[in-house]
Amino acid sequence: PQCNEILDRIIAEKLDLTWSGYIRTSLITPDLARRMVQSGVGDLEVAITSGSQVVLNELHMGFRLDNLYDGCRYLKEAGFTGNLILNYSLNSPGDTETTLMESVASYKKIAAILGEDRVFPMLFFLGVQPHTGFEQRLIQEGYLSGGYNPLSLNPVAVKKMLYNPPPLSHLIARACLRAWDKTAWEQASPAGRSVHELYADESLFRGVVENAGRDVLINLEQDLLARGVGQSRNRP
């Protein structure tokens, strides 16, 4: 109700502004999408986390992918013209080669709805936070020792706090390194556009302007297909 009231006031007052937000498109209705567009919505950021419903359920994310896709369609139908940043947490608990392929497919599905030139996947790994269910799970599974120090500056300990275990970590790393090739980036950079003109740091610049996250996902898809992942679904 508060969200609708704010948007309605912006529309009623005819305020000429552009706003952005971190949202859950799974909660967007056709009416809300209309209000968002009429009130001046710009770019949006969405935590999709994974393209696998199984992984999302295991992480207790509390939404269904079908509803997220519907929200994107409602935005498109309402006339949304901004960019959509999709946050993925690769190699989450429960991820497999098959679910990674599902994440690639989810990006493609959203890009087909809104347009590839307006959908920007950003790739993250889950950070371990003390006194959380995630931390307790990792202790029970033996990934973390029961007496570990979350404030330790030991490089091995710090690395473990960013959850990206093998064997999927190696597959993801190869896809990232190919996408982050410095020479290819320099050749593709738009003429006259610098990092400092557009974004606070180089990572955001390359993530949005160069769409490096998309390149990582496409590389990952190619590697997974080469390993035979998902091929059975594509056979007639």
Show which residues each predicted segment covers.
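C-terminal non-catalytic accessory extensions
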Residues: 200-236
